């Protein structure tokens, strides 16, 4: 792979991993239009590591808070001491919600992955992009109300995790579906976006660990295209994530819907020719 190809794929990965337009849907469409074969596993894993790093940096304060809170909670459990502050209580609850949401994601995601070769057809991708667009469009009616972490129930976390598992289907945007689900379930905008991206961390790590098993059984080669692609995915992904969080908080999440409708329609047309 040429270095410029690595950069281009890094840009696509960085943008579509976080913006609610479906990274898998774009991958299938680009491969079909340009006759590109699936990227080497090591290159694909490297791109995802770049976008994962972007999430870790953007949400480093939340991750640090949860780590400290869980640590203090463990000490308190054995020492019979209650958590020290409201911040500890919030960190413990947020960590628990992520665990609850990750369980259905893992079960449903792993189940669908066993038959994912059946899903990568252009008509299906087009139809799922239309579904994504519809979900995004419906969020325009969500006002600024809703609950934060304090009112966030485990049931809500479970259903958002289910939605994330379904995002294995190409054309369904993970961020779009989970943020929309959070809004529909009564979360406020900031909490819906915050939980969506925190919930994606164990999902990405789990998927990459599974890929690493195959990776180490093959031949991995670090070249310039891989390095540039990973760095590009990180930089572009960081910027895309910051922009998307601001858009969600401003109540303009639905603005991505027309793009999904147009791309979904074009994909359906190409797939059924």
From Swiss-Prot:
What processes in GO biological process is this protein linked to? cell wall organization; peptidoglycan biosynthetic process; regulation of cell shape; response to antibiotic
Membrane-traversing stretches: 1-21, 39-59, 63-83, 92-112, 118-138, 165-185, 195-215, 225-245, 252-272
The record's Pfam families line, in alphabetical order, gives:
BacA
Its keywords, alphabetically, are:
Antibiotic resistance, Cell inner membrane, Cell membrane, Cell shape, Cell wall biogenesis/degradation, Hydrolase, Membrane, Peptidoglycan synthesis, Transmembrane, Transmembrane helix
User: What are the record's GO terms for cellular component?
Assistant: plasma membrane
Specify whether Glycoprotein is a keyword of the entry.
Answer: no
**Top EC class for this record:** hydrolase
Indicate how the chain sits in the lipid bilayer.
Answer: Multi-pass membrane protein
Known EC number: 3.6.1.27
UniProt GO molecular function? undecaprenyl-diphosphatase activity
Identify the InterPro entries for this entry.
UppP
Query: What chemistry does it catalyse, as a reaction equation?
Result: di-trans,octa-cis-undecaprenyl diphosphate + H2O = di-trans,octa-cis-undecaprenyl phosphate + phosphate + H(+)
Q: Where in the cell is it found?
A: Cell inner membrane
The protein's job, in short, is:
Catalyzes the dephosphorylation of undecaprenyl diphosphate (UPP). Confers resistance to bacitracin.
Q: What else is known?
A: Bacitracin is thought to be involved in the inhibition of peptidoglycan synthesis by sequestering undecaprenyl diphosphate, thereby reducing the pool of lipid carrier available.
Q: Which family does it belong to?
A: Belongs to the UppP family.
Q: By what name is this protein known?
A: Undecaprenyl-diphosphatase
* Species of the source: Desulfosudis oleivorans (strain DSM 6200 / JCM 39069 / Hxd3)
Name of the coding gene: uppP
